[in-house]
């Protein structure tokens, strides 16, 4: 998937000036307009391929579907709650964020919240401003020796752990992705959730808002917690069930909470905010000069690197694309798309299961990015729903009635060589199998249904190819085919054949353009098809 035609970027929220400068220095045109209504945003996006936002702009399905040229949405920050990911993915719009840009600021705010909870600093400050001097009311607790439960051990969770360990806190945590060994390497004991609840004096959450994390702290889990537990949420509103938290505060099960985020922002229900044991901020996790500068810089660099084909980072809705930018993988992406296009032309809108098989050590983990490229080739001509690309391929293939499986086999000795890297695309239960490889940076077709091409056939983007199977002993076949090309006004640019397989030979002709019809050809050969990717 190329982004070379991405030329104009709209920045619709306030960002550090470095963002605009980096984009412009990278050759991109930039428009900055803030506080746009939905209608105004749609109007501005009509001639923009890229959009960069913070949290204020709502990139809804209506906006995405109405922005015909939109290719990429960049979120200068971590959370993408304000972007409709499903709509973006369906439209084939890439969504990126800056996962590390505000990590330090969010971690520092979390640590500040923990200290404020322990010593009731905001409440004591408010009391002093009211002219009071009440030392007994604000009795606190030391952090030293207390147990901190960290739910989510990504960058922010790790930074929090390091800082609070310096206060003498014991850190335990939970993360379904991070292994116990990795967690132990930064001083966190990984435990199942049911063991964390009764163990912790303080709990802080640092997970994304997902169906599996919504209401992670609820009536049931609060009941399992140590009485007097204190809770911090500087991640996403909704991870802590706000109703359950209020009930736990009212009963004394929870001694205090520090909230930087809410299910609804700003919160209309003031019960939590007004509770005397709640510290709250208006979503300030990334509100530092350093974080804003870092996020603006990172998202701009990501856009420029993407357009120049250097790298792709921070991808939210198509992680497989990240591999597509490596020099080794790029030509294999082209091969996969070519074989998918070939399979569609050959099998005629196939149904059932498409098998994508990689072979060779260097392709061991490549299936995740090659299978979407195969799908692009399969569906590009058939799909009437949207432009098929590496972002939406897996979503659209299911709707097309196809199942795509990916597997890997090691390189084996044989005619292809020892350990040679190959890509096979086949239709399960049907006589359609194509095998390709990459020579240098050029995708090559090596085999069709066991018929080997020596040398291999170059598969070049934009080069029409006609493939047909016929008996090798027919002396008039080739002159007849050339005559049919002449009648259609199509030039023959290249020609080669496979070895004989099952009594037939595959012939491949490079053409100046695709033929308007293959009906005349099919009268003279066993089968024929043409394609161009």
From Swiss-Prot:
**Cross-link Glycyl lysine isopeptide (Lys-Gly) (interchain with G-Cter in SUMO1): residue positions:** 21
Please list the tissues where expression of this protein has been recorded: Liver, kidney, brain, testis.
Keyword flag Phosphoprotein? yes
Q: Which enzyme class? A: oxidoreductase
The record ties this protein, via Gene3D superfamilies, to: D-3-phosphoglycerate dehydrogenase, domain 3 (3.30.1330.90), NAD(P)-binding Rossmann-like Domain (3.40.50.720)
Q: What is its EC number?
A: 1.1.1.95
Pathway connected to this protein: Amino-acid biosynthesis; L-serine biosynthesis; L-serine from 3-phospho-D-glycerate: step 1/3
- Residues the record lists as Phosphothreonine modifications: 78
**Cross-link Glycyl lysine isopeptide (Lys-Gly) (interchain with G-Cter in SUMO2), residue numbers?**
21
Instruction: Using the record's annotations, give every residue carrying the modification Phosphoserine.
Output: 14
The entry marks the following residues as binding NAD(+), namely 78, 155-156, 175, 207, 234-236, 260, 283-286
Q: Which residues carry this modification: N-acetylalanine?
A: 2
> What GO molecular-function term can you cite, just one?
phosphoglycerate dehydrogenase activity
Give UniProt keywords alphabetically: Acetylation, Amino-acid biosynthesis, Isopeptide bond, NAD, Oxidoreductase, Phosphoprotein, Serine biosynthesis, Ubl conjugation
Catalytic residues, per the record, are 236, 265, 283
- List the catalytic activities from the record: (2R)-3-phosphoglycerate + NAD(+) = 3-phosphooxypyruvate + NADH + H(+)
Q: What does this protein do?
A: Catalyzes the reversible oxidation of 3-phospho-D-glycerate to 3-phosphonooxypyruvate, the first step of the phosphorylated L-serine biosynthesis pathway. Does not catalyze the reversible oxidation of 2-hydroxyglutarate to 2-oxoglutarate and the reversible oxidation of (S)-malate to oxaloacetate.
Query: Its family?
Result: Belongs to the D-isomer specific 2-hydroxyacid dehydrogenase family.
Query: Could you identify this protein by its name?
Result: D-3-phosphoglycerate dehydrogenase
Q: Which organism is it from?
A: Rattus norvegicus
Give the lineage: Eukaryota, Metazoa, Chordata, Craniata, Vertebrata
In the UniProt record, the gene name given for this protein reads Phgdh
């Amino acid at each position: 998937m190329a982004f070379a035609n991405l030329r104009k970027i709209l920045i619709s929220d306030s960002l550090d000036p470095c963002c605009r400068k980096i984009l412009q220095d990278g050759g991109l045109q930039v428009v900055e307009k803030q506080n746009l209504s939905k209608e105004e945003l749609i109007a501005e996006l009509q001639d923009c391929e890229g959009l960069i936002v913070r949290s204020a702009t709502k990139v809804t399905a209506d906006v995405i579907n109405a922005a015909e040229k939109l290719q990429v949405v960049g979120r200068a920050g971590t959370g993408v709650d304000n972007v409709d990911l499903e709509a973006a993915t369906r439209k084939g719009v890439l969504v990126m964020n800056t996962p590390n840009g505000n990590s330090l600021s969010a971690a520092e705010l979390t640590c500040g919240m923990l200290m404020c909870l322990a010593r009731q600093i905001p409440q004591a400050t408010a009391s002093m401003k009211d002219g009071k001097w009440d030392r007994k009311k604000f009795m606190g607790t030391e952090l030293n020796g207390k147990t901190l439960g960290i739910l989510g051990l990504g960058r922010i969770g790790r930074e929090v752990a390091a800082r609070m360990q310096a206060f003498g806190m014991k850190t335990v945590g939970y993360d379904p992705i991070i292994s116990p060994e990795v967690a132990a390497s930064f001083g966190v004991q990984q435990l199942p959730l049911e063991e964390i609840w009764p163990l912790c004096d303080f709990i802080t959450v640092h997970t994304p808002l997902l169906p599996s994390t919504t209401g992670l702290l609820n009536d049931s889990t609060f009941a399992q917690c140590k009485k007097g537990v204190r809770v911090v949420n500087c991640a996403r509103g909704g991870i802590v069930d706000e109703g359950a938290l209020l009930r736990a505060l009212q009963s004394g099960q929870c001694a205090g909470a520090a909230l930087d985020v809410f299910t609804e922002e700003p919160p209309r229900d003031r019960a939590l905010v007004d509770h005397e044991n709640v510290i709250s901020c208006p979503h300030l996790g990334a509100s530092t000069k350093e974080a804003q500068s870092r996020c603006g810089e990172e998202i701009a660099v990501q856009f420029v690197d993407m357009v120049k084909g250097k790298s792709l980072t921070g991808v939210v809705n198509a992680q497989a694309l990240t591999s597509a930018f490596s020099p080794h993988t790029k030509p294999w992406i082209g091969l996969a798309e070519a074989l998918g296009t070939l399979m569609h032309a050959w099998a005629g809108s196939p149904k059932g299961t498409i098998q994508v098989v990689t072979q060779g050590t260097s392709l061991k983990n490549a299936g995740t990015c090659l299978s979407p490229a195969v799908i692009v080739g399969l569906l590009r001509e058939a799909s009437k729903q949207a432009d098929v690309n590496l972002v939406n391929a897996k979503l659209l293939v299911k709707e097309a009635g196809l199942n795509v499986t990916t597997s890997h086999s090691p390189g084996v000795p044989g005619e292809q060589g020892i350990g040679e890297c190959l890509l096979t695309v086949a239709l399960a239960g049907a006589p359609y199998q194509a095998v390709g490889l990459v020579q240098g940076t050029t995708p090559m077709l090596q085999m069709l249904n066991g018929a080997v091409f020596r040398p291999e056939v170059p598969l070049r983007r934009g080069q029409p190819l006609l493939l047909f199977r016929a008996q090798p002993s027919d002396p008039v076949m080739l002159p007849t085919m050339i005559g049919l090309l002449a009648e259609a006004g199509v030039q023959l640019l290249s020609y080669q054949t496979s070895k004989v397989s099952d009594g037939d030979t595959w012939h491949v002709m490079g053409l100046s353009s695709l033929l308007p019809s293959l009906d005349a050809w099919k009268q003279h050969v066993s089968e024929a098809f043409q394609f161009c990717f």
